[in-house]
Amino acid sequence: MLNKAIVPAAAVLVFLAASCNSGRKEPLVEKLSLEDTTKYVTFKMDVELPAPVDASSTAIREGIISSLDDQLTRITTYEDERMFPFYEGDHNDTDALLGYYKDQAFSLLSKEAEEDAQERIGYLMADDELSEEDFARMIEETPKWEYEYSFEKIGETPSYVVYFSRNYIYMGGAHGGITGAGALTFDKSDGHLVEHIIDPSSTVPMQSLLVKGLLGYYSENGVEMNEEELLGSLFIEDGIIPLPGWEPYPEGDSLVFTYQQYEIASYAEGMPSFQLPVNDLLPYLTSEAKAILGL
């Protein structure tokens, strides 16, 4: 039987006040935290959704659900295949919606973690050179899988709202890894996802800015280097730094750029992240980005 530790079954509704001057209140936000565990896996899920109070918030909610579905239905595969179906129930019922994805994802992880553990135990049982003491110790040390999924709001203005999707997964290897969809910026005028903040064709003309940002990241982490040393250390082709797979997102008067693990650097170097002033990026912003930024 599964040991369950589910943090409140009902979603928490929270009012977020926008501006004290305007007296306007932002739409209701629904937050749900779920957790489940077995002997070989722990699953945690924290999701924040806008309540569907109007057309814009409903569209944003559906965009988040689509992204959540895309990630959780593929958590144990690198192929472009679904491991369980899209939720066809009422998308306005947050408990049922997220409960479905938690149950499906946890069931999938539980099955594969159990299979992995039994395979490891089988190898140990076949090793005639192991003492009983070592065998018992290694059985006790069988790795426990972990999966932590979060989708939370990280920024909002009257024109746009930014949500961030991030998940940590450990499947018994040397270390875990961080993946996810990254930042999703929605236009609040109608709730559509702004797919590109930076024009994807801007990679080459933006090289000096990307170099500047990365040199700043390494300097802040105690590593001083020049441009030549930087380019020689990165996992890039032809000396060209790519735009990050995660879309940059607005924060104040800047855009935040974050590279994922192994995207351009080693695991030990973390996830290079830096901010660049919007004013320096004007030639490279998409028309949609300029619209939500009021440019």
Description of each model-found segment:
Residues 1-28:
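Bacterial Sec-dependent N-terminal signal peptides
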Residues 20-295:
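Compositionally biased intrinsically disordered regions enriched in Thr/Gly
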